[in-house]
Design a protein with these regions (language model features):
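An alpha-helical, amphipathic repeat domain used for nucleic-acid recognition
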Residues: 1-111
Length: 111
């Protein structure tokens, strides 16, 4: 079954993506993929991503910390799997290190 593309203007997409990012932490790549699903062109997508970062709707470091903490506590993922998933989402190495740093070594060993 083919994915149906919903076409939005950049203004409509910005409103929708703000709500989507406010609901839970998102990385830039997730937001970028969602904007392309809205049928936007590359220039519009990159402008909206820049605006979301400036407005602090998207923060890669905050995302990495939330992602790593959640996957470790809830899904019991190890650091290697968390790192692989963050890399797949194109999160920077700096942010990945920040995210993994919140996992307590004592808790990690006991898992």
């Amino acid at each position: 079954m083919e994915k149906q593309i919903k076409y939005h203007t950049p203004e409509q997409a910005l409103i929708k993506i703000r709500d989507w990012c406010a609901y839970q932490e998102r990385c830039q790549q997730e937001a970028r993929d969602k904007l392309y699903d809205y049928g936007l062109k590359t220039d519009d997508v990159e402008n909206i991503i820049a605006q979301l970062v400036n407005e602090n709707f998207i923060n890669e470091e905050r995302f990495a910390i939330a992602f790593a903490g959640g996957k470790f506590r809830i899904k019991k993922w190890g650091k290697v799997k968390i790192k692989q998933e963050l890399k797949a989402k194109r999160v920077s190495d700096y942010c990945i290190k920040k995210g993994l740093a919140i996992i307590d070594n004592t808790d990690y060993i006991n898992t």
